[in-house]
Amino acid sequence: MSKIRPLGDRVVVKRSEDETKTPCGIVIPDSAAEKQDQGTVVALGPGKKDSEGARVPMEVRLGDRVLFGKYAGQSIKVDDEDLMVMREEDIVAVIE
């Protein structure tokens, strides 16, 4: 993967692979499959600045599995990998 360095409080997330089969074996075509709203954090910005100019540390860490809103962020493609760039506030939870 190319090196991508997000700015401010932005996070780069690699979307989780979509399931193409249901547990009972039914194959779901790409046209009917909904994109999963979860992924793994692969890059972090340095954090946003507060009103006094000090950096606010990021709450998520590299490698965290996260949930995000359906319309969160921007989809990008880097080296044939589908990634999302979003603000940290668009992440709703860390999956532990």
Swiss-Prot record:
It holds the Pfam family Cpn10. SMART domains: Cpn10. Keywords: Chaperone, Cytoplasm. Signal peptide: none annotated. The keyword Cytoplasm applies. Its main location: cytoplasm. Gene3D superfamilies: GroES chaperonin (2.30.33.40). GO terms for biological process: chaperone cofactor-dependent protein refolding. Heptamer of 7 subunits arranged in a ring. Interacts with the chaperonin GroEL. Belongs to the GroES chaperonin family. This is Co-chaperonin GroES. It comes from Tremblaya princeps.
